[in-house]
Amino acid sequence: MKKVIFATGNEGKMKEIREILGDLDIELLSLKDAGIHADIVEDGKSFEENAQIKAKAICELTGEIVLADDSGLEIDYLNKEPGIYSARYMGEDTSYHIKNAKLIERLEGVPDEKRTARFVCAIAAAFPDGSMKTVRAAMEGRIGYKESGENGFGYDPIFYLPEYGCTSAELSMEEKNKISHRGKALRAIKDELR
């Protein structure tokens, strides 16, 4: 069985990933599962560059196939903020409840049609032979007026999906994986792992 490391320590993200890649004949490990404690500086200028930096570094360290993602929220009215800084927005130790409240506050008085946003996910697959494949996907929506929903994590409770009439935190894991930015990107990279 092929071993694949997904370069994350985020258990919520790993749950989502295992759901989508679970039918592949691979042993899928998180950094924690693989016993890796690497502090990689993500200094790329795009989601793609950051994913590639992470995947390459862990692949070189382990000699295994490594998947890494960089994802975030782009809000059009805020010039695509928080963008590649989504995880570090307002500081890494700031809870998403506080981050979400701040974004809602920054959009106070902004009408629905100008609250457009997207979740973006870039996934890089680094292989021991030095090759790399990168994909990018997005999920379009808008920023809601309050947090809603218990499923998901991060900015999900404020990311409203008009066609579903709810936030991404109100979708089941199965529903979310069908339409999410990460789900789309994982399905796009899946063939590289067969």
Residues covered by each model-derived region:
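Anionic-ligand binding patches
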Residues: 2-5, 11-194
